[in-house]
A protein has these predicted regions:
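C-terminal amphipathic alpha-helical interaction region
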Residues: 493, 498-698
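Active-site-proximal loop/turn and secondary-structure-junction residues that shape catalytic pockets
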Residues: 44-48, 68-70, 98-99, 146, ...
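Short linear, low-complexity motifs centered on an aromatic residue
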Residues: 73-89, 105-108, 207, 214-216, ...
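Catalytic pocket of metal/acid-base enzymes, prominently hydrolases
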Residues: 1-27, 41, 122-142, 442, ...
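Active-site proximal loops enriched in glycine and acidic residues that flank catalytic Cys/His/Asp
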Residues: 44, 68, 96, 274-276, ...
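Glycine-rich, acidic/polar active-site loops that bind/position phosphate-bearing ligands
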Residues: 121-306, 315-318, 325-562
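Gly-rich Lys/Arg/Thr-decorated short loops/hinges at beta-loop-alpha junctions or inter-strand turns
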Residues: 1-14, 33-35, 223-232
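Active-site core of metal-dependent hydrolases
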Residues: 8-120
Length: 698
């Protein structure tokens, strides 16, 4: 029987394969490129390409693709065969260094946000050697960046790599001040916890909203939801367990460190969490994970829903972005050590994170802004739209002591005794967890909990890296060259705490009183919707920071603003059109059919027994008739609004109409349709109900 270690990474051209397949000088040169960013010589690229091709062909590959992440939010690929004609009329397998390093896909059909006209079709893909190539099916996939003919980034990987480069530069400056001359590189490491729903494929195919939108737009509340908390960490059902086993195997073959799996809070909701990896690799792996989750689900006659809010009335899905900074010498810069009060380097990086989040709240919020995530944030199941940091009692007390120049006595670790002799004693952590916080310190990392389940983690990590890099730059500028480093460091930490402690909140983020305190007393931002959040990227401070660090150009910032707003508008427009279609073609005919049979029942009963009241049937007929009229009116009103929306030329104006008008009309249509569902006999309802969907996988 094969063990996981026998096949883990078997479809990845990783360091083990490179060491075995490449000449020693070529391997050493490529490692310098990967580890230090050194340029790659042509002869090295040719040698790597040959070895990569031979290895891929051995594993059954016939094609290669430059695998990239355009601004659509999903991955893209164009497959080219290895074959080339030979003089004898046959074919040989070829793959050159040039084909490895650079590709030229048509860029005209990808979102550009005005960076290029449709007729300007040329785009380039460039190999990212820090992310290993892998085989998917019969295709060698080469992770790449994607840019326009004139050099603007048209993808999510390029600015992520730029942000990592900026963060590395500034973090090294700070570490040198503490005498860390041996550190050559600082990298952000990420572990995204992926939540998802699994539903029966046959039921999925009967619902237009799921097929077109990935989430339900109608659905009356079933008798049972998540009230009993019996699904969270519950026994995994056989069909789901078989899916998870298959999924793990596929992910492990691709070198993805899938580690933890469990049932989540809502019925049919689950989670998959990997071990941490460097941010750009974690981003690639998460994109692959989402793709494979959906493919594997289909093999099991299931559908994997990645939408943030696929069902009303139960928890939605997020993607907790666990983030820390690590040196190439193996040090986690967010690890407090045994005595955080005395760990000056840790305290400086901690304060940098606090200042970064406070100064750039809006960038963090907009990094997770989508139409789907708007339904989740602030809904007492996910963090509120107000950004705050949870540090826990011990670290907060440490910072308070520094701010007030008072002694800190420390928090002793206590042993928990459960009162049963056979059970082990264990040490209690000095910090609890706060599941309501958007940005929580959890012992040696920060957990950014606002990312949507279907979203790429690239944008969130770009903004985290950028804000941190800018803050570390400010700290380095102040500390470099000072005559008394310890005194200057103490003053900087103290001033940072005093200036930015408003962002620290260890309480209940779901409490309405907190939102009031945050906005009215602390002056924190409450950007509740995507249009509100996206607009802040154009603020002068944000543009200057992102451009000065060379993460984005001004044109790239503007383009992303346009693309994200367009995506918001198109997403909601599709949902609105789907609601109108379902209401008119499915829900109203079902209600009318039931009304017809009810009327026939009344006629038959009164004919058989003249004078019968038939109160139940007549009351139901009256209610359903009224609801049918209201459904028709609400569908027409929404349809008219969507038609008018098409005539609005400016995407910003359209987004605000959607926020203020369209979403309200969609909600009004849903209310009456859901009410009709609740009093219509099951056999008449035209598609599976919430009860069917949420409890249909056994």
């Amino acid at each position: 029987m094969r063990t996981v270690s026998d096949y883990f990474g078997s479809l990845v051209f990783d360091d083990r394969v490179m060491r075995a397949k490449l000449p020693s000088d070529v391997y050493a040169s490529l490692k310098r490129t990967i580890d230090e960013g050194a340029s790659l010589d042509t002869h090295v690229a040719d040698a790597v390409a040959t070895a990569m091709r031979d290895w891929a062909v051995e594993h059954g590959a016939t094609h290669f693709t430059h695998w990239f992440q355009p601004l659509t939010g999903v991955t893209a690929e164009k497959h080219d065969g290895f074959i080339a004609p030979s003089p004898d009329g046959g074919v040989i397998m070829e793959f050159s260094g040039k084909e490895l390093i650079q590709g030229e896909p048509d860029a005209s059909s990808f979102p550009s946000g005005g960076l290029r006209a449709t007729f300007e079709a040329r785009g380039y893909t460039a190999w990212d050697p820090t992310s290993y190539a892998f085989i998917k099916g019969h295709t060698l996939c080469i992770p790449t960046a994607f840019c326009s003919y004139s050099g603007e980034a048209l993808d999510k990987k390029t600015p992520l790599l730029r942000s990592m480069q900026a963060l590395n530069k500034q973090a090294l400056r700070v570490l040198k001040l503490f005498g860390n001359e041996d550190v050559k590189c600082v990298r952000p490491c990420v572990g995204p916890e992926q939540e998802y729903f699994l539903i029966d494929k046959a039921m999925y195919e009967k619902r237009k909203d799921l097929v077109f939108c990935g989430r339900t737009l109608f659905g009356a509340k079933p008798p049972k939801g998540q009230e009993l908390d019996d699904h969270y960490f519950g026994a995994i059902k056989p069909r789901v367990e078989a899916y998870m086993e298959d999924l793990n195997t596929e992910l492990w073959k691709l070198g993805i460190l899938a580690k933890t799996e469990h049932n989540e809070v809502a019925p049919s909701q689950h989670e998959l969490a990997p071990i941490f990896s460097v941010a750009n690799i974690a981003t690639d792996h998460n994109q692959l994970t989402m793709e494979i989750m959906q493919k594997v689900a289909s093999r099991h006659d299931l559908v994997c829903l990645l939408a943030e809010k696929p069902f009303a009335g139960v928890n939605g899905s997020g993607k907790h972005n666990n983030w820390y900074l690590a040196t190439d010498t193996g040090v986690n810069l967010f690890k407090p050590g045994e005595t955080p009060y005395e760990n000056a380097q840790f305290l400086l990086f901690l304060c940098a994170a606090v200042q970064a989040v406070d100064n750039y709240q809006n960038l963090l919020r907009l990094s997770v802004a989508t139409a789907g995530n708007d339904h989740r944030l602030g809904a007492n199941e996910a963090p509120p739209a107000v950004i705050s940091i949870f540090l826990g009692d011990e670290l907060t007390a440490v910072l308070d002591a520094i701010e007030t120049d008072t002694p800190y006595s420390g928090t002793e670790k206590t042993v928990l005794k459960l009162g049963v002799h056979v059970l082990p004693k264990f040490t209690r952590d000095t910090t609890d967890r706060n599941r309501t916080s958007p940005f929580a310190f959890t012992g040696n990392k920060f957990e950014f909990r606002m990312v949507g389940s279907s979203d790429s983690i690239a944008c969130a990590n770009i903004m985290l890296n950028a804000a941190m890099a800018e803050t570390l730059k400010e700290f380095s500028d102040r500390l470099e060259g000072v005559s008394d480093f310890e005194s200057a460091l103490h003053d900087l930490i103290k001033e940072t705490i005093k200036a930015h402690k408003r962002i620290i909140f260890n309480g209940n983020g779901y409490d309405d009183a907190w939102i009031k305190e945050a906005t009215e007393k602390r002056g924190l931002l409450n950007l509740r919707t995507t249009p509100d959040a996206l607009a802040t990227v154009l603020e002068k401070k944000n543009v200057e920071m992102l451009t000065s660090l060379k993460i984005f150009s001004e044109a790239e910032i503007r383009s992303r603003y346009e693309i994200c707003l367009e995506n918001y508008c198109k997403t909601v427009n599709i949902e609105g059109l789907t609601m109108v279609d379902m209401a008119r073609k499915e829900i109203l005919p079902a209600v009318e059919a039931y009304l017809g049979d009810l009327s026939g029942t009344v006629a038959a009963k009164t004919a058989a027994v003249p004078g019968l009241a038939c109160k139940y049937e007549k009351d139901l007929i009256s209610k359903l008739s009224k609801l049918a009229d209201e459904i028709s009116d609400a569908a027409s009103s929404l349809d008219t609004t969507l038609i008018r929306l098409k005539a609005i030329p400016d995407v910003t104006d359209a987004a605000y109409v959607i926020r203020d008008v369209v979403l309200q009309k969609m909600a009004e249509l849903r209310v009456v349709c859901d009410e009709a569902e609740s009093i219509t006999a099951d056999k008449y309802w035209p598609f599976p109900t919430y009860g069917d969907l949420l409890f249909g996988v056994r």
